[in-house]
């Protein structure tokens, strides 16, 4: 997976 995708998933998880 690309680093951007990983960051996006991490950001969403953090928001939730």
Curated annotation (Swiss-Prot):
Subcellular location: Secreted
In-chain residues carrying the UniProt-annotated modification Leucine amide: 16
Origin: domain of life: Eukaryota
Record's GO cellular component terms: extracellular region
Signal sequence extent: none
A GO biological process held by the record: innate immune response
Keywords assigned: Amidation, Amphibian defense peptide, Antimicrobial, Immunity, Innate immunity, Pharmaceutical, Secreted
Tissue spec: Expressed by the skin glands.
Record function comment: Probable antimicrobial peptide that can stimulate insulin release in INS-1 cells in a dose-dependent manner and without increasing the influx of calcium.
Family: Belongs to the frog skin active peptide (FSAP) family. Temporin subfamily.
Protein name per its UniProtKB record: Temporin
Lineage: Eukaryota, Metazoa, Chordata, Craniata, Vertebrata
């Amino acid at each position: 997976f690309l680093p951007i995708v990983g960051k996006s998933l991490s950001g969403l998880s953090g928001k939730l």
